[in-house]
Amino acid sequence: MAAPMEVAVCTDSAAQLWSCVVWELHSGANLLTYRGGQAGPRGLALLNGEYLLAAQLGKNYICAWELQRKDQLQQKIMCPGPVTCLTTSPNGLYVLAGISENIYLWEVSTGNLLVILSRHYQDVSCLQFTGDSSHFISGGKDCLVLAWSLCSVLQADPSRTPAPRHVWSRHTLPITDLHCGFGGPLARVATASLDQTVKLWEVSSGELLLSVLFDVGILAVTMDLAEHYMFCGGSDGSIFQVDLCTWPGQREKSFQPEQEHGKVFRGHRNQVTCLSVSTDGSVLLSGSHDETVRLWDVQSQQCLRTVTLKGPVTNACIMLAPVSMLSSDFRPGLPLPHFNKHLLGAEHGDEPHRGGLMLRLGLHQQGSEPSYLERVEQLQAVMSSTLEKNVLGGQDQLRIRVTELEDEVRNLRKINRDLFDFSTRIITHPTK
């Protein structure tokens, strides 16, 4: 069985020839292009391996393409304002978007807007889910990083504002990027800021594990899958590689390029805006405002390939190509629904049901279907009725059986009495 193909997905702010391009990572061959708009920074996301979503730069809508129908825009998801960042949950159930200082959470299966989170004081700049979709992290221009529990957000009282699980306020300038490692609720999160620091946090405890100070502002951060290295993109075009395994025990330390031989990637002429590492950790992809995307060998820090675009790079990431991306016969399991701009229940003034969720079976079928809870109630009613009938039927059979036994006892007593009388007559009146 052939190994999954790794591809690079890139966008730029010009979008003259296409909105998004996909090329094979190692050969550099162009595989796909998507047309229909300009994707903003931190605004590109893959939904359930079936759709590609792109938040439009300075626009109040999100473009959605079916992966294999690259030339046909599937849907425009209208939003209340310009989308500053976008992400999807790894399980494909939810879409998160930052709009001004608010975070919007949609349910993919229904298109319902479940909640609007308003805990940032300035624009939200980056969003990302943990690998198990149990938590998501948000960073903003207010210098705050918030860790949210998805379960707590969905179960919160509609009359009360959901609270984040952790509030990380150690940065002093706007947050520019964040990266969430593997481990679900035990994951580690790297946050980058214009204050020239990258900080490493633990989701479970909320503790600060590491803070690295650089000489320039950091606009992009990522880690390899094994989390041995952390890569930080600077405003001067440099990319710094931090070895997390051999880092000294102190929690805060300055990164000194002259003392970190071979730990700096140099080649970009302008600020580095996005970074991504291949699954085996051997290749690093970087995008910059110098309108180039570069592929680097991590071991030697040498540039393997340079791809020139038509404008500043807004998104560049490495991913395993989904089956739907390379197969022309593949179709999504479910169509993408219409995404609501208003909270669930608020659009039609349905106050009693605001914030509630209804699980339905067979959403792809036409017509009204009973809800899951209604079906459970019907099943319980049938089971109770059957049990009652069985109990009543058993009592009737018991009464009939008792009557039969009583009749049999009476017959036996009569026979016994007749035998006694016969024996008495024989004894008292012997035959002559």
Curated annotation (Swiss-Prot):
Major place of residence: nucleus
Localization (cell): Nucleus, Nucleolus; Nucleus, Nucleoplasm; Cytoplasm; Dynein axonemal particle
UniProt keyword annotation of Cell division present: no
Keywords, ordered alphabetically: Cytoplasm, Developmental protein, Nucleus, Repeat, WD repeat
GO cellular component, one term: dynein axonemal particle
PROSITE patterns: WD_REPEATS_1, WD_REPEATS_2, WD_REPEATS_REGION
GO aspect biological process, one term: DNA-templated DNA replication
Keyword Nucleus: yes
Spans of repeat WD: 36-75, 78-116, 119-158, 170-211, 213-257, 267-306
Family statement: Belongs to the WD repeat IPI3/WDR18 family.
Binding partners and assembly: Component of the 5FMC complex, at least composed of PELP1, LAS1L, TEX10, WDR18 and SENP3; the complex interacts with methylated CHTOP and ZNF148. Interacts with NOL9. Component of the PELP1 complex, composed of at least PELP1, TEX10 and WDR18. The complex interacts with pre-60S ribosome particles.
PANTHER family (UniProt xref): WD REPEAT-CONTAINING PROTEIN 18 (PTHR18763:SF0), WD-REPEAT PROTEIN 18 (PTHR18763)
Record function comment: Functions as a component of the Five Friends of Methylated CHTOP (5FMC) complex; the 5FMC complex is recruited to ZNF148 by methylated CHTOP, leading to desumoylation of ZNF148 and subsequent transactivation of ZNF148 target genes. Component of the PELP1 complex involved in the nucleolar steps of 28S rRNA maturation and the subsequent nucleoplasmic transit of the pre-60S ribosomal subunit. May play a role during development.
The name this protein goes by in its record: WD repeat-containing protein 18
Upper taxonomic lineage: Eukaryota, Metazoa, Chordata, Craniata, Vertebrata
